[in-house]
Curated annotation (Swiss-Prot):
Record keywords, A-Z: Acetylation, Cytoplasm, Transferase
Lineage: Eukaryota, Metazoa, Chordata, Craniata, Vertebrata
Protein name per its UniProtKB record: Glutathione S-transferase alpha M14
Positions annotated to bind glutathione: Y9, Q54, V55, Q67, T68
Modified residues (N-acetylmethionine): M1
Reactions listed under catalytic activity: RX + glutathione = an S-substituted glutathione + a halide anion + H(+); prostaglandin A2 + glutathione = prostaglandin A2-S-(R)-glutathione; prostaglandin J2 + glutathione = prostaglandin J2-S-(R)-glutathione; (13S)-hydroperoxy-(9Z,11E)-octadecadienoate + 2 glutathione = (13S)-hydroxy-(9Z,11E)-octadecadienoate + glutathione disulfide + H2O
Length: 222
C-alpha cells in the first residue's frame, strides 16, 4: 500500500494551498514537512529532490513532483477530477488558468507597498466583478448544470471555490451578484471531504501577511 503524499513547503498558503485543497477534496490524507529555514531548502536542493530548485514539491507514488500545475494535473488525473476526454480537460485547463490569474493577484496583495494597496485592492475588485466572476457565472448559466464541466466535480470546481473564499476574504460583497457561483460554493463546501477540510484544526492554512511572505521569499527562489 502506497504511503500518504508528503508535501514540502512552508507553513502557509502560497502555491501549495491549491494542492492541499485538491487532495482534501479527493479524500486523500497527506503529510506536510514544513520548510522553516534556508538550510531546510538547501537540504532538499542538495539531495536532488527539487528538479528546478523550487518548491512546492510533493512526494507521491515514488515521484518527487515539482511545478504546481504538474502536481495538480497528476492528482486530478489520479483521482478522476480531470474530465472524461481531451475536450473536457481543455475546458478544465482553461477555467483553472483563469482562476490562477485572479488568485495570483490576491496572493501577492500583501506585498503591495502601503501607499499602493488601496489602488491594488480596487483593481482586484474591479477585475473580479467585471472579468473573472461574470465569466464563471456565464459558464454555469450556459449549461444549467451543477458543476463547470461535464456535470461532474472536477479540479476546476475545487480551485474556483477555493478562489471564491479568497474573494470573500477580500470583500464579502463581491459575490452578491453571482447567485450561481454562490450556489457552487455552497455545493462544493458541503461535500463531506471539503466540509472536513474547512473545519478548524484541518491542514487548511490561514491568510498570509506581508511579513510571512517576505520571510519565505528570502530563501525560496522564484
Amino acid at each position: 500500500m502506497a504511503g500518504k503524499p508528503i508535501l514540502h513547503y512552508f507553513n502557509g498558503r502560497g502555491r501549495m494551498e491549491c494542492i492541499r485543497w485538491l487532495l482534501a477534496a479527493a479524500g486523500v490524507e497527506f503529510e506536510e514537512k514544513f520548510i522553516k529555514t534556508p538550510e531546510d531548502l538547501d537540504k532538499l536542493t542538495n539531495d536532488g529532490s527539487l528538479l528546478f530548485q523550487q518548491v512546492p514539491m510533493v512526494e507521491i507514488d515514488g515521484m518527487k513532483l515539482v511545478q504546481t500545475r504538474a502536481i495538480l494535473n497528476y492528482i486530478a488525473t489520479k483521482y478522476n477530477l480531470y474530465g472524461k476526454d481531451a475536450k473536457e480537460r481543455a475546458l478544465i485547463d482553461m477555467y483553472t488558468e483563469g482562476v490562477a490569474d485572479l488568485g495570483e493577484m490576491i496572493l501577492l496583495l500583501p506585498l503591495c507597498p502601503p501607499n499602493e494597496k488601496d489602488a491594488k485592492v480596487a483593481s482586484i475588485k474591479e477585475k473580479s466583478t467585471n472579468r473573472y466572476l461574470p465569466a464563471f457565472e456565464k459558464v454555469l448559466k450556459s449549461h444549467g448544470q451543477d458543476y463547470l464541466v461535464g456535470n461532474k466535480l472536477s479540479r476546476a470546481d475545487i480551485q474556483l471555490v477555493e478562489l471564491l473564499y479568497y474573494v470573500e476574504e477580500l470583500d464579502p460583497s463581491l459575490l452578491a451578484n453571482f447567485p450561481l457561483l454562490k450556489a457552487l460554493k455552497t455545493r462544493v463546501s458541503n461535500l463531506p471531504t471539503v466540509k472536513k477540510f474547512l473545519q478548524p484544526g484541518s491542514q487548511r492554512k490561514p491568510p498570509m501577511d506581508a511579513k510571512k511572505i517576505r520571510r519565505s521569499q528570502e530563501y525560496f527562489p522564484d
